[in-house]
Structures are given as C-alpha cells and as structure tokens.
Amino acid sequence: DSLLRTFYLDFFELMARVTIARSRKHIEKYYNTSDIGKFPERLPPLSLRPRLTDLNDAINYNDIYSLLMSLNLSIYTPSNYIMPSKLAKYLDLTHHKGTSLTQQGREEGIRRLMSINLLKRLESSVYSFRLTVDRIRTLIDGTIQTINNYQSGGCVLNLTEISDDEDFDYDDQNTDLFSVGKKVKIDLADMDYVSWKRELEKDAENLELLSLMIADITPEHDTKLQTLFDLIRKKIEHPINPGNRKVLIFTAFSDTADYLYANVSKFAKEKFGLNTAEVTGVVEGKTTIPKLRADLNTVLTCFSPISKGKDILLPGSSAEIDILIGTD
C-alpha cells in the first residue's frame, strides 16, 4: 500500500493503457480460477427495434428512407458541373500528386459517404440526424445564395467549405477522401451553375420537408430514448447482482452522446439519485458530480472504483458514477 501511494496518477493511467485485456476463455484456460470463482453467466443480448416516435401520423423510417433516396447531394460534387471547355484549367489542381484520386473522384466518394452517413445518423439518434440534415440544408442555402449573387467573373466557389467531415464517424474520417485535396477553388464562370442550382434547390426542398417532419420528435416523443429509459429503470430496480446499478452506453457519434447525456443524466438523477458521466475523447468529459474532474481516468475510476483502485487514487472521495456514456 505504501508503495502504491508513492506513485503519481500518471503511472496508473499508463498501466491502464498497456495492460493486456484477456478474455474470459483465456483466463479460464490458462489461470487458476479457484480463488476467484466462475465468471457470472451472461444474459442473451436483446435486439430491440423501437419505432421512431409515438406521435400519431408522424413520419416513420420508411418515409425518411424514401426522401433520402431522392436526394442528389450535388452540393458535394461541384466539379461535375465544370463546363467541358474549362476542365483543362482545373486538371493539375484537382489531380492530387502521389495518388490516383481526382477531385471529381474525391467529391463523388464524399457524396456516397454522406448518403450512407445520413442513414447511420438516423440509426444513431433522431437528434444527430436532425443536426446533419440542418447542416446540409444550411450549406445548400448558402451556395444557392452565392449563385444568386453571382456576377460574371466576380465569384469563386471555395470547395474547402463543402468538405467538412464533422458529420462522419471516425472510420469514415480516416479515408483518403478527407486527407487530400481540400484547397481547390472553382470560378462560377467556369460552371454550369444553372443546372447545379436546379439540383441544389430540389435537395433543399426535400431537406426542408425532412426537417419539418422530424421537428416534433422531442425527447418526450423519441421512442428510442424512452425505450432506453425503460431499460435503465429495469436494470436499477431489478439488478442482476445485488447493488449493481452500473450502466454503460456506447454510441458512434459524439453528438448522440451529448443528447443521451443531457436526457439520461436528468432522468437518472431525478428518478434514482444516480450520477452520470460522458466521455467522448473529443472534448473534456461531463459528469453530474460537482467539482469532479471529468477526464477519462477519473471518470473510469469513479465508474469502476474497485477495479481502478479508487480508494488509493481518490482517497476520501465517496462520489461514484453509475451510468457512463461514451463513443465507440
């Protein structure tokens, strides 16, 4: 004990990062478990498919899918509208040295990713989906306004503004599509901007319709969120192990984690007096415990006090986190 007390907190964080995680089967096969006993039996996973909302006559997943499939998403492919006589002007600028990826190829890749990503965002949460729909719509509206204000030779379209990757998950952000070619500019005088504007206006109309149709799905009417509340309630009121009220929630997107934290923390505190924390790796974490540092190590220590040696790392602290929300 005296030796452990001499170590700085950084030592334990380092050990947590380099320690090899062994599976149950590995431990049962190579280690003597007579002292610790058998691992608890795992319950079968639950596969739930809640409705989008409990509102009558509201939009459903099929309606949203149909609208998404109607989107052209030409906001991500402006190079397709460069006039043939002007293509040579942009050839050297849009063909990235050292790769076979052209600007047109990159744009088409991002367009396809965004088409798939809209479905991913919807699967994650209606909140994340709404954010992405509104961001794309704002981007399209701004581009249409640029075209409307266009005067011959006086306007340049900066493609940096339409290659934002904040709506994509971590795996998609690591593709070459987001690592090369973010500096290309196209003069609107070199584009068939009339055709492009026509396609943009179609998408803007459909996105506005989508935004209006999901606007009424507040947390109170978000069936997926309410289903999560029911699962948490059952876990706390009928724990598998006596006194075990721990809940770990993973999501692919940090803004879904924010949405869950805002609602789950309030629900857990008001109904059961439990503390909640959020760790996404993007920004400093959050916790309902006043004055507690919300860094990863402190949050994990308060969430799993026995395994993390909380009595040594945070002596005298009685604070404990029961619900932890994080990104994959």
Question: Can you say where each PLM-predicted feature lies in the sequence?
Answer:
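Conserved RecA-like P-loop NTPase helicase motor core
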Residues: E220, S265-D328
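Long, low-complexity, polar/charged, intrinsically disordered or flexibly structured peripheral segments
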Residues: L67-H96, N174-E220
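Inter-lobe coupling linker of SF2 helicases/translocases
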Residues: D1-I162
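A short acidic (Asp/Glu
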Residues: V133, I147, A257-N263, T288
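Phosphate/oxyanion-binding active-site loops and adjacent basic polyanion-contact surfaces
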Residues: I217-F229, T256-A257, L292-V299
